[in-house]
Amino acid sequence: MNFKYIVAVSFLIASGYARSEENDVQSLSQREVLEEESLREIRGIGGALLSAGKSALKGLAKGFAEHFGKRTAEDHEVMKRLEAVMRDLDSLDHPEEASERETRGFNQEEIANLFTKKEKRILGPVLSLVGSALGGLIKKIG
């Protein structure tokens, strides 16, 4: 009789362990799906910010070109820098497959840090160029 109880309890423990393993596997796959969705959201937000920045810079560049007509050497250099920044922004619109494979293993915080570093690397020069261009424009108007 004791043997039957031992077998029954062992069976219950084994089935409970199997269920917990199954639940762990399911929760792990759910976490992977959520991480993948978060990556897509982050990329979507980054793409939207980059496209908004690009359109603003294009409008600014067109405005400068229309307003000044002929450019001085300094204006020409500023426009060259803006065009280089625009090319950099265009290259960020289409991330390569390799970078996507690299980011799959990162957690959300690491991914957010990567995007922040890229934004700082791009937005710093862009803001300084826009600031200097606007400063030159204000000097010419004033």
UniProtKB/Swiss-Prot annotation:
Post-translational modification Isoleucine amide, affected residues: I141
Signal peptide: 1-18
Modification sites for Phenylalanine amide: F68
Organ and tissue specificity: Expressed by the skin glands.
Gene Ontology cellular component list: extracellular region
UniProt superkingdom: Eukaryota
Main location: secreted
Pro-peptide positions on chain: 19-43, 72-121
Record GO biological process: defense response to bacterium; defense response to fungus; killing of cells of another organism
Entry annotated with the keyword Iron: no
Keywords from the named record: Amidation, Amphibian defense peptide, Antibiotic, Antimicrobial, Cleavage on pair of basic residues, Cytolysis, Fungicide, Hemolysis, Secreted, Signal
Compartments where found: Secreted
Similarity field: Belongs to the bombinin family.
Function: Maximin-y shows antimicrobial activity against bacteria and against the fungus C.albicans. It has little hemolytic activity. Maximin-Hv shows antimicrobial activity against bacteria and against the fungus C.albicans. Shows strong hemolytic activity.
The protein's name in its UniProt record: Maximins y/Hv type 1
Source organism per UniProt: Bombina maxima
